[in-house]
Amino acid sequence: MTKRLKMIGRVKELEILSNACDKKTSQLIAVYGRRRIGKTYLINHMFSEHKKECSFFRFTGSYMLDSSTQKDNFIEAIHDWFKEEPTTSIENWMSAFNFLKRTIQKLQNQNQKIVIFLDEVPWIDKKNNGGFIGALGHFWNEFALNTNNIVLILCGSNSSWIKEKIFEDSSGPLYQRLDIKIHLKPFDLKETKEYLLKEKKFIIDDKTIAETYMIFGGVAKYLSLLDSSKTIAANIDELIFNSDGHLNKEYSEVLKSLFDTKASYYSSIIEILSSKQSGMTQTKIAEALGEKSGSKIKDAMEELSEAGFIVGLSKLHSKINTNYIICDPFVLFYNKWVRAFSKNELISLQKPYFSTIMGTQSYAIWSGFAFEILCLSNIDLYLQTRMTKGLAKNYGYWIFPGNENDSGAQIDFIVEYENSVYDIVECKFYNKEFIISKEYKENILHKIEMFKKYALKGKYDIKLIMLTTYGCEKNSHYNSLNIAQDIDLGSLL
C-alpha cells in the first residue's frame, strides 16, 4: 500500500490492516489494549474510509448480558447486516456460527473480502460457559481457513483475557492460529499534541499539552471530550470534579468492566501504589494488603500491567526487585485528587476547584512525579530526541540504600545502551527554566559516584541528561556539570 491513510497516529496499525485485506489468504487478527483508546474507531475508520469494497460485519459483546442473550443478539446482528433469517432454531454458539457460515456462502460475490469484526470479545462469553470459543475456533479452522477471503478481527479491552484464552491456551482451538496481533496503545505525547491542536483546535503551548497528558494520558476518548472554547482547567472541573461529569465515575466503571468481581481488590492495589510515588515491589504491596506474596497478588499485578495501569521497572542489573508504579496518567490523577471525595463533597466543592489546587505545593510535588511518568511513558520519543533508538538495551531505575561508608542514592530514570553507555536522566517539571543549585548539583554528583561505585564493573560511559519543561538556566552550576544534552518539551514534541 503506497497511499498513506490519514488519521492522527495509528499509521502503522492502518498499514497492517490494509495489507491484511490484500492478502490472498484468510487472516485472523487480534486487536487489544486499554479501554477508550480507539480500538473500535480504528477498525471502523479502516473499513468505512479506506476499504469500503469489503463486506463488513460487526458484532459487539455486552458487559451485562449472559452468553445466551449475546448469542441471540449475534443472530440479530447477522440479520441486520446481511438480511438473512435462520430457518431453524439457533440453540447454541456452534449453531450460531454455522448460520454465519451459511450466510457468507450465499453471498453473490465470493471473491469479495468479508470482514468479521467481533468487538469486546471477552464480554461475549466471559467464562466460556456457552461454548463461544470452541464454536469460534470451529468456524475459523473448518471454514474460514479454507477460504481465501475472510478477515476475522477479534477485539477487546481485557488484554489478559485475550492473551489467556486466545494467545496462550495451548489446548484452545485458536492456539497459534493468529496471523496478526495489534497491541494498540494510547497516543504518545506528540500524537496528543497533534490531536489537541488539529482535531480539537486548541491554541495552547507545550507545557499545557504536557499537563493535559499528565491528567488524561493519550486516551483518545478522554481527549475527545475536551472543549476548546474552555480552558483545560475548566474542562477538568467539568469532566472530573463535577458529580455528574462525564469522567467522574470513569475510574470505577473501567475497573468493573475489566475485572468484574476482582475490581475492588485491584482498586486496593492501585490505592496502595498511588500513596507511594517511588513505587513498591510485589512483596511490599502484599504486606500492605496484609497477605503473603503468592499467586493471587502475582496474577493481579499481571492483569493490571496488561491493562496498562501499572508498569514494573527493573532495578538495573538485577533480575529481582521489580518496582511497580502507576503508569496510567488518568488513574494516577484520579487516585490522588478525586477518589477521596464523596458525591456530596464534590457537589459542595468550591468552583472552580481544579484552578485552586494548581498553585499549591502538593500539586507541584504531584506534577513532578506525573512528569516523570510522562517521560517514562514516552521513552520512544526520548530515544528519538537522543538519536539512540536502535541502541537502547534497557531502561529502569537504580537504588543504593546506603551503608556505613556512603549515604544512599536513587536514580529514577536510567537508560542502558550497548557498549556500557548509560543515560542518567533528571526529569524536572518547572514553570520556567530549571535552575540548578549548588545543593542539587552535589546531589547529582553523589548519585553518579554511587552508581559508578556500586553498580558498574569494568568499562562505562555515563551521560547526564536534563529533561525539563523549558530547559535549564546556564548558570555556573550547570556549566560545572558535564551535561550531555539539555532536552526541553519542545525537543520531544
Task: Please annotate each region the language model reported.
Residues 54-87, 333:
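Conserved NTP-binding/hydrolysis module of P-loop NTPases
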Residues 180-207:
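Conserved small helical "lid"/interfacial subdomain of P-loop NTPases
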Residues 379, 411-431, 444, 464:
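Conserved catalytic cores of phosphodiester-cleaving nucleases, focusing on short active-site segments
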Residues 221-222, 226-410:
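Accessory nucleic acid-recognition modules appended to NTPase machines
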Residues 39:
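Conserved lysine of the Walker
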Residues 456-493:
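Domain-level recognition of nuclease-like catalytic cores that cleave nucleotide substrates
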Residues 123-124, 128, 132, 136-171:
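Sensor-1/coupling segment of RecA-like P-loop NTPase cores
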Residues 42, 46:
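Hydrophobic positions on the alpha1 helix immediately C-terminal to the Walker A/P-loop
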